[in-house]
Amino acid sequence: MRNDLVLEDTTLRDGEQTPGVAFSKETKTAILNALIEAGVTSIEIGIPAMGGEELDFIKSVVDRQDEARLVVWHRGVREDVERSLDLGFTSVHVGLPTSAGHLKASVRKDRTWLLATARDMVKMAKDRGAFVSISAEDIARTEISFLQEYAGVVAEAGADRLRLSDTVGLLGPEAYGERVAAVLSAADIDVQCHAHNDFGLATANTLAGLKAGARYFHVTVNAIGERAGMADLAQVVVALKKLYDRDLGIDLTKLKKVSRLVAEAAGHQVLPWQPITGDNVFAHESGIHANGMFRDTSSFEPFPPEHVGGERRYVLGKHSGRALVAWALEQEGITPREELLPHCLEEVRALSIRIGGAVSHEQLVEIYNKAAA
């Protein structure tokens, strides 16, 4: 895995393509600010060809390109890219399909058109001094030999990077890594991973692509995006930091704050068990786990919650043990009598089953006081 990896967040483009999600100009600005504050240095901001408020937002941030690389996304239409360059943007992306099926269904063109269009658009944008990124979309259903040919054409034209998009998440990690390696062996160009989560493998595929030599990778906050979403910013960044010793300069303590901002904007809740940013990631209920945590907090946590802006919680419930009941009472200023703990534990478990959830400290105190009376 390289040491010069570059994260690019696409919450404002692919993330907003989540069915039912629409960000206002003000919301997109707030998300952009939060990403930059967290240390994200490359951000795909939207699609100028949509016009309206989308274009208003894009125009409003053209003077902020010194804060992060701001990438604008385009169809395979030369005039679209030219308009973005005329606005003053210096980083452009062109989305083009490479599979025969997508070429026929999406743009009604063939591969002769594709190669000519890709070459022309890259050369035009490079002649104007832009950083040029271009897609190979639907790589799972594109022959590896054609991916290599396409990579050679866009590299020769001067493209700065090739985005390998597993558009409907059909690849496993081994197959995704194989395609990255095949492209890198055939062309002198940086590769960007763009993995969708239809089989729950977007994070694994992104890491596999990076291990195969890709430099860039796409993520979204909370993994939002088309259908099942894509690779999650927090998951990939923390995995790189904790498992692969790659520090991308992201302020991990801001991950949960950014996650909640985007969740509210998208009208979605963050699942309690969402890795890294979910509320249950550092929550403990079962007796064995809580007992171990009281002795050594590394027993049942991969890293301290404060590393990612989280908090440790202990939850009273059906699976709790006496140690957790005693601890909870002590938190309420009560030194529990040892002989009352078995009864209190039995009552906590029974109440948890009746209400179908966690027992509050107030309910525990009531149970204890009745037993002690």
UniProtKB/Swiss-Prot annotation:
Gene3D superfamilies: 1.10.238.260, Aldolase class I (3.20.20.70). GO terms for molecular function: acyltransferase activity, acyl groups converted into alkyl on transfer. It catalyses: 3-phosphonopyruvate + acetyl-CoA + H2O = (R)-2-(phosphonomethyl)malate + CoA + H(+). Pathway: Antibiotic biosynthesis. Coiled coil: none annotated. Keywords: Antibiotic biosynthesis, Transferase. CDD domains: DRE_TIM_NifV. It comes from the Bacteria. It is an enzyme of class 2 (transferase). Acyltransferase involved in the biosynthesis of the phosphonate antibiotic FR-900098, a potent antimalarial agent that acts as an inhibitor of 1-deoxy-D-xylulose 5-phosphate reductoisomerase (DXR), the first enzyme in the nonmevalonate pathway for isoprenoid biosynthesis. Catalyzes the condensation between acetyl-CoA and phosphonopyruvate to yield (R)-2-(phosphonomethyl)malate. Belongs to the alpha-IPM synthase/homocitrate synthase family. PANTHER family: HOMOCITRATE SYNTHASE, ISOPROPYLMALATE_HOMOCITRATE_CITRAMALATE SYNTHASE FAMILY PROTEIN. This is 2-phosphonomethylmalate synthase. It comes from Streptomyces rubellomurinus (strain ATCC 31215). The lineage of its organism: Bacteria, Bacillati, Actinomycetota, Actinomycetes, Kitasatosporales. The gene is frbC.
